[in-house]
Amino acid sequence: MSTTPVVNFITGNANKLREVKAILEPGITVQSKTVNLEEVQGTVEEVTLAKCRKAAEIIQGPVLVEDTCLCFKALNDLPGPYIKWFMESIGHQGLNNLLVAYEDKSADAVCTFAYSPGPGHEPILFQGRTRGKIVPPRGPADFGWDAIFEYDGQTYAEMDKTAKNNISHRGLALRKLQDWFAQQ
């Protein structure tokens, strides 16, 4: 008889926590821990691995960390892993303004999770990617850049939460994590 895996999801973002719990539970128990982790500069993979190693040391147990990118094709994948700071600095309209001079409004939403069973264990990466485009804000503006990322005619903000979780970058990455746990 197997036991339900437990992970300590390291986040201070209530919206992310809700999404992760909605996707993973009841198969994987998600506990929330807020730990102030310094974000290194680098690729999304480097950032996520560094955060996971540090969190595992602090928590002294199994941890799950996440890093999200929004990659504008016209800007050679910027803002990429720096989307959080771009959002805080220039908001939805500013992000749209970055693409005014370009015909190509396509973008990839990329979510990278790292899981570690604890300190001393090398983290395992799980990545999901959704191709969409950047549009003027539509829908509630209460979750990051969801209101400007359109997939198949709807922004993430306009979508029903279950529908979004089925196709989103975060949902895709978490399904890979679920598959990995099922193999253990």
UniProtKB/Swiss-Prot annotation:
Its cofactor is Mg(2+); Mn(2+). Its EC number is 3.6.1.66. Mg(2+) binds at residue 39. SUPFAM superfamilies: ITPase-like. ITP binds at residues 11-16, 51, 67-68, 84, 143-146, 164, 169-170. It is found in: Cytoplasm; Nucleus. Belongs to the HAM1 NTPase family. GO terms for molecular function: dITP diphosphatase activity; ITP diphosphatase activity; metal ion binding; nucleotide binding; XTP diphosphatase activity. It catalyses: ITP + H2O = IMP + diphosphate + H(+); dITP + H2O = dIMP + diphosphate + H(+); XTP + H2O = XMP + diphosphate + H(+). This is Inosine triphosphate pyrophosphatase. It is an enzyme of class 3 (hydrolase). Its main location: cytoplasm. GO terms for biological process: deoxyribonucleoside triphosphate catabolic process; nucleotide metabolic process. Keywords: Cytoplasm, Hydrolase, Magnesium, Manganese, Metal-binding, Nucleotide metabolism, Nucleotide-binding, Nucleus. It comes from Colletotrichum graminicola (strain M1.001 / M2 / FGSC 10212) (Maize anthracnose fungus). Homodimer. Pyrophosphatase that hydrolyzes non-canonical purine nucleotides such as inosine triphosphate (ITP), deoxyinosine triphosphate (dITP) or xanthosine 5'-triphosphate (XTP) to their respective monophosphate derivatives. The enzyme does not distinguish between the deoxy- and ribose forms. Probably excludes non-canonical purines from RNA and DNA precursor pools, thus preventing their incorporation into RNA and DNA and avoiding chromosomal lesions.
